[in-house]
Amino acid sequence: MTSPLNRRTLLLGVVPAAALGLSACGSSSSQSSSTASASASASASGSASASASASASAAPSGSATASATADDGYVGYRFNREVPGAGTATLYTDYQCPYCAKAEPKFEEAAKKLDGVLNVTVRHMPLNMHVNAVPAALAVEAAEAQGKHLEMANKLFATQNDWKGISERDKLRTLFNDYAKELGLNTEEFDKVLLASDTVKPIQRDDDHAVKIGVKGTPTFVVNDKVVEGLDSSSSVDDLVSTFKREAGVK
């Protein structure tokens, strides 16, 4: 893989996420690619074309609590109680992806319905086409250090239009610190983690695993490390629940 990202460069928000080993959007092999007539997808040029439903695609690159899959025992941040021995449904997400913003609330609801049945988790996959996806993922990691991963994730999804186009490092950093303050976080600690060189490691780990299992875009739903076809941001909560149970062999 490529060398670790410089933390200051990350916060500029202008370095391609390809530095994480990611590649451009628009894989023709993915169901959620720009060639799929039934979905809205974002092309490699960064422009979105809309039709019936939605996900942003990329060529292969790779309250919630941390938990630890086949790569190193890590399965992502948990959206429900851990069920030892049960299957795991995972959402690969990009906080700048508008389709992830639509998918994640339904994923959260599905997690509630699957509590005690399946493990439901989320992992990072910042796309090359979204210049501030990596800084946003860093903000989520910095919030998780104080137990507020989900709160920061939801804040970023709700305010995408406010930060997605910011290119000045200091302005983006200040805004994310403002969000941390709104969420009741210790901003000094938040900023320290935001700038720490190690904070990118879980993002890199998630992307590496996404590459390994064939994730091609966001949002992508995976059950037991197998990409689930037929689901995207337009899928209902009931569709998510029934599909996850079927793929996991749960009646």
Segments (PLM) and residue ranges:
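Structural alpha/beta surface segment adjacent to cysteine/selenocysteine redox centers
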Residues: 90-96, 101-175
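C-terminal cap of thioredoxin/glutaredoxin-like
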Residues: 2-5, 9, 27-37, 181-251
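Extracytoplasmic thiol/disulfide redox context detector
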Residues: 2-129, 243-251
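Short clusters of hydrophobic/aromatic residues that line enzyme substrate/ligand-binding pockets
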Residues: 79-81, 163, 228
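Internal amphipathic alpha-helical segments of the cytochrome P450 catalytic fold
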Residues: 22, 149-153, 187
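Surface-exposed charge patches
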Residues: 141, 178, 208
